[in-house]
Design a protein with these regions (language model features):
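Short, contiguous clusters of charged residues that form electrostatic/catalytic patches at enzyme active sites
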Residues: 110, 114, 170-177, 271, ...
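A structural preference for long, well-packed, hydrophobic secondary-structure segments
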Residues: 75-78, 88-94, 166-189, 221-224
Length: 308
């Protein structure tokens, strides 16, 4: 990612995704990528007209039957990328977010594009869901080039939305219940969210995650934050006006007076979130939006290896 941070936005998301994936595969993460992508899985009967590239001729000599070697790269995976696009995801509220200074939504959009490109390389099916105060976008998981173009278009549209134009609260519960029923069973569901919901407890929110698990989905929850200000409340020693981006409520205060108690509250929230994810066998991945895509890509690769 570091070599691409100078690029101004908006620019071609698809091109960016290809560059990141190629760099990831050929760079320091080469071994784990190739480890799962070409690992032998099983034999399957050869069908007339197929390429003879993967025929196991030694097995043919023993059985007088044609079998193809099937690799784990060929084991189809269905993946649904889910993005929380509520108002809190536009934090930090930069006038023009960049890859060098992203907000949570921008990182989610580009991370989703990168993930889709990686899934495409593995011939896995991918779909996209986006929610705010309702389920705004839902595409089924498919493998076609035309479908990939549709998803890129939806991702680009997310970057064009003016966060100041309308306040969008989070309605993850209803959206995830819908997604649970709409996505093919036993899919991998990857959710990008900051887990900010003003009117719902974690217990209430996890009812939807329980639904995902009940329908045999594997879930990776990417918990995005800008830790310096969102968790540690590190600001200059002066009064600020804070605005709740999902309610519009305003409050004036001096952050340094509340930093310790706020940090403790944030840590307790994270601890509770970790316990909930552990309870329901959900992979929780903490993502510092200032540190790029490696954490996200590595988490996916490890999960895929475990699934197959």
């Amino acid at each position: 990612m570091k070599n691409l941070e100078h690029i101004n936005l908006p620019f071609n998301i698809e091109l960016f995704a290809k560059q990141v994936v190629e760099g990831f595969i050929t760079g320091k993460h080469q071994s784990p990528y190739h480890g799962f992508s070409v690992e032998f899985a099983e034999h399957r009967l050869y069908n007339t007209g197929e390429s003879t590239k993967h025929i196991d001729w030694k097995l043919y000599g023993r059985t007088d039957k044609l079998f193809n070697k099937r690799y784990k790269e060929e084991t189809n995976l269905r993946c649904q990328l889910v993005i929380d696009a509520s108002s809190s995801m536009y934090y930090p509220n930069f006038e023009k977010p960049t890859l060098e200074k992203p907000n949570k939504l921008l990182l989610s959009v580009y991370a989703s594009a990168v993930m889709m490109n990686l899934l495409k390389k593995q011939r896995d099916a991918v779909g996209l869901s986006v929610f705010t105060d309702k389920l705004d976008v839902h595409t089924p998981n498919k493998t076609t080039q035309r479908h990939h173009r549709v998803i890129y278009h939806e991702l680009e549209n997310l970057l064009k939305v003016d966060a100041k134009a309308s306040i969008k609260k989070t309605a993850s519960i209803d959206a995830l219940h819908q997604i649970s029923e709409m996505v093919h069973k036993r899919s991998l569901v990857m959710i990008f969210t900051d887990f900010i919901s003003n009117d719902k407890t974690l217990d209430e929110q996890f009812e939807a995650y329980k639904h995902l698990k009940h329908n045999k989905h594997e879930v990776i929850l990417f918990y995005l934050s800008e830790p310096t200000t969102e968790i540690n409340l590190e600001f200059d020693n002066k009064p600020y006006k804070f605005i709740d981006v999902e309610s519009g409520e305003e409050m004036k205060l001096s952050p340094h007076l509340y930093a310790e108690s706020f940090k403790k509250q944030s840590q307790n929230h994270l601890k509770e979130l970790k316990l909930k994810c552990l309870q329901y066998k959900i992979d929780l991945v903490e993502v510092d939006i200032n540190k790029g895509f490696d954490t996200i890509l590595n988490s996916y690769l490890l999960k895929r290896q475990k699934m197959f």
